[in-house]
Regions:
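Residues that define the transmembrane beta-barrel architecture of outer-membrane proteins
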Residues: 66-68, 103-107, 158-162, 180, ...
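Outer-membrane beta-barrel pore domains and translocons
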Residues: 73-77, 126-128, 169, 187-191, ...
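Residues on the lipid-exposed face of transmembrane beta-strands in outer-membrane beta-barrel proteins
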Residues: 72, 109-113, 164-168, 186-188, ...
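Extracellular/periplasm-exposed beta-strand and loop segments of Gram-negative cell-envelope proteins
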Residues: 80-105, 127-161, 192-223, 251, ...
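Transmembrane beta-strand segments that form the barrel wall of outer-membrane beta-barrel proteins
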Residues: 240-255, 279
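Short glycine/proline- and aromatic-enriched beta-strand/turn motifs that initiate or cap beta-hairpins
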Residues: 29-124, 306-308
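Short loop/turn motifs that connect adjacent beta-strands in outer-membrane beta-barrel proteins
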Residues: 58-66, 118, 171-181, 236-240, ...
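Predominantly the C-terminal beta-signal and adjacent terminal strand-loop region
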Residues: 260-312
Length: 312
């Protein structure tokens, strides 16, 4: 009986302990779950993420003329070549004559290819041709043909220039949003001039032996030179910019070359209208029998096309 009472008392104690300790632990679990649930953000009412900003072409890509482009120009220059007697002349008669006349409007073309982020390779070409009718002030030998003093000449010439220029952005650095850029120009140029002379009033003349007298002459002078210079462009407004450049090179008693230009450029869509002034000067080497030199200033207009504008 005593053992039965002890067993009953032990069972009652275990049950009482389970009630006092086990039930609160079970009651606390929903509270913890409720606390975890209240910390989760409500899915309703969340703002949608903002749209990605549109891609913008910066001023350094196209507005400053650095994108790939093709330009056609029309140059209204004036001036004419003149021939001088070179140091290599040993025949005792000069080779001096002023071509006279006005040049025809000169077509020109430029291809610009980006090299790196802000630099460009520019390949340009122009052609000037003209006619003149000078009268020789003295007896002369021109390209091996003898002319008399007072001879009336018909002169025709064609001058061409091809230039490859590496335009390197030198200031500012880093570029960021600068509207003003300065570039150093590293160039190589090929220049040639072909000239023909004729004395039309002496056609049909013969010498003492009855042989016809040659009264026409033809010659070509050319040279390849490096040239160095500076270029600048300024973004006046979103579609309007100013551009200028100048370069040249000379050796003492050798050939000389320089050119300069300044223009205002208005962009619309993939095109840009140009208007400005430019000048070009060259002189072939005076170490030869004869040399030719000329300076051509004038105004020009142009149309520039950016085929890849808007694709970036």
């Amino acid at each position: 009986m005593r053992n039965a009472l002890k067993t009953a008392a032990w069972i009652a104690g275990v049950c009482l302990g389970f009630v006092l300790h086990g039930q609160p632990a079970a009651a606390q679990q929903p509270a913890a779950q409720q606390q975890t649930t209240t910390q989760q953000p409500a899915p309703a009412g969340q703002p949608s993420p903002p749209p990605a900003p549109p891609q913008v072409v910066t001023a350094g890509d196209f507005y400053a003329g650095d994108g790939i482009s093709i330009t056609a120009q029309y140059w209204l220059g004036y001036g004419h070549p003149s021939m001088g007697t070179g140091h290599g002349n040993g025949n005792g008669e000069p080779s001096s004559v002023d071509y006279l006349g006005k040049p025809r409007p000169a077509p020109a073309g430029i291809i610009s290819i980006p090299v790196g982020k802000h630099n460009a390779l520019r390949i340009s070409y122009f052609r000037i041709q003209g006619n003149g009718n000078p009268t020789l002030p003295a007896a002369s030998i021109i390209y091996g043909t003898s002319y008399n003093q007072g001879d009336y000449l018909a002169v025709h010439y064609v001058m061409q220039n091809v230039k490859a220029s590496f335009d390197y952005l030198s200031w500012p650095f880093p570029v960021k949003d600068s509207k003003f850029h300065i570039k150093t120009l590293w160039e190589v140029q090929y220049t040639n001039i072909a000239s023909s002379f004729d004395a039309p009033l002496r056609h049909g003349q013969t010498d003492a032996s009855g042989a016809p007298i040659i009264v026409s002459a033809y010659g070509k002078d050319w040279f390849i030179y490096p040239s160095f210079g500076l270029g600048a462009d300024y973004l006046i407004s979103h579609n309007f910019r100013f551009e200028a450049r100048a370069s040249g090179f000379a050796f003492p008693h050798r050939a000389t070359i320089w050119d300069t230009e300044a223009s205002l450029n208005y962009r619309f869509g993939k095109f840009e209208i140009q208007g400005g002034v430019k000048a070009f000067h060259f002189k072939t080497s005076p170490e030869k029998v004869e040399f030719v030199q000329a300076t051509y200033p004038g105004a020009f207009v142009g149309l520039r096309w950016y085929p890849e504008y808007g694709k970036r």
